Amino acid sequence: MTTTETSLSADTKNGIDFKIADLSLADFGRKELRIAEHEMPGLMSLRREYAEVQPLKGARISGSLHMTVQTAVLIETLTALGAEVRWASCNIFSTQDHAAAAVVVGPHGTPEEPKGVPVFAWKGESLEEYWWCAEQMLTWPDSDKPANMILDDGGDATMLVLRGMQYEKAGVVPPAEEDDSAEWKVFLGLLRSRFETDKGKWTKIAESVKGVTEETTTGVLRLYQFAAAGDLAFPAINVNDSVTKSKFDNKYGTRHSLIDGINRGTDALIGGKKVLICGYGDVGKGCAEAMKGQGARVSVTEIDPINALQAMMEGFDVVTVEDAIGDADIVVTSTGNKDIIMLEHIKAMKDHSILGNIGHFDNEIDMAGLERSGATRTNIKPQVDLWTFGDTGRSIIVLSEGRLLNLGNATGHPSFVMSNSFANQTIAQIELWTKNDEYDNEVYRLPKHLDEKVARIHVEALGGRLTKLTKDQAEYLGVDVEGPYKPDHYRY
């Protein structure tokens, strides 16, 4: 689907507004969704536990998170617990169009008479389309009943509301600077256009929102920045730093999906190749382990000496980008930072080497610099481009335009590991919605006993049997027989 900003408009059927690629894909999406449900015991357990209680009744959740089959199970869990939901993807390439169709049609609808949830997402959005979808996700049909909860991945939905409110209070949307990214220019353009027609839209939404739950490292960083500046207008729960999210989704999910993305994108043999992983946090650990398991010769870059030492103890060389870039066959960024692989690094890469990102945003790789460099871009297939430098004749294979290759070139993390993350998201939404008066406008983490609850569900689903403490043993350790078993400062 390709449209211009001026021609974008939502479709409406059976009272549901939406914008997706193809409603006729719903049956395929529903079949995959049913399989995913069997692989997502955390979400299905929460449905059984809370279906009668309806703890999210009255919640109007605006969700910005990759519109995948696994996310479809999350959305239908939220609605099963009483919430109303509107959704958009948090990445221009990550939507699975059949999953989006299944959610709009719903379990009891048809493409002719959908009975599901409004979704605004399709694979391959332009930046203008992406931010239009984000606004639609946050714009509820009844202006007197705006969104009152946000479920976010990367912080774009939260940023749209908070920056919009900030500029409304200032009475002006600032102009874009010449060196601003293309996306920031589109973002400011959207806010400026909306300010001309409604000077209080985002303030009204911000005042209605009871809280936000954030999925990712990048989004959490944004939340802490808003809080430090005094600009966080509602409570936030940092889902990312739940142990059953960061130590599972970030590491084991990446370990699975990185290889999947490279294989689907390039069919290149990984064994024997020299691989450079930029960043050795939880995501980088999963990347390095995956590549090592394929027989690659792996090097790692790091700023933190503790992470660097961990990498070396696992047998990885710790190097700088400048030292290693010229010898690497595959380069993957996983830092959550910006300006990791710059144009001069790309020019130094081997002919036909592979470059991709599995952090969050495309600013880990200097895609803007590459586009301005005069290099010729040849599209090989969707989300696979060959960039050729005229002065050297060397070509570089870039995956997903520098955005998340595991979602752009493949289908993201597997259902079971996402069950951990999305169970945390659901619990966090319930926590903020039902106990809102216990939270200030700060960033919180879920309590340890809820983290252990999520883990316990998945241990049992895999057939594990937990040892139970005796009363004497529990007293000896200074914990309750039923947990939590570790202090908050414990490093898993």
Swiss-Prot record:
Belongs to the adenosylhomocysteinase family. It is found in: Cytoplasm. Its EC number is 3.13.2.1. SUPFAM superfamilies: Formate/glycerate dehydrogenase catalytic domain-like (SSF52283), NAD(P)-binding Rossmann-fold domains (SSF51735). This is Adenosylhomocysteinase. GO terms for cellular component: cytosol. InterPro entries: Adenosylhomocyst_ase-like_sf, Adenosylhomocysteinase-like, Ado_hCys_hydrolase_NAD-bd, NAD(P)-bd_dom_sf, S-Ado-L-homoCys_hydrolase_CS. One of its GO terms (molecular function) is adenosylhomocysteinase activity. The keyword Nucleotide-binding does not apply. It is an enzyme of class 3 (hydrolase). Binds 1 NAD(+) per subunit. PANTHER family: ADENOSYLHOMOCYSTEINASE (PTHR23420:SF0).
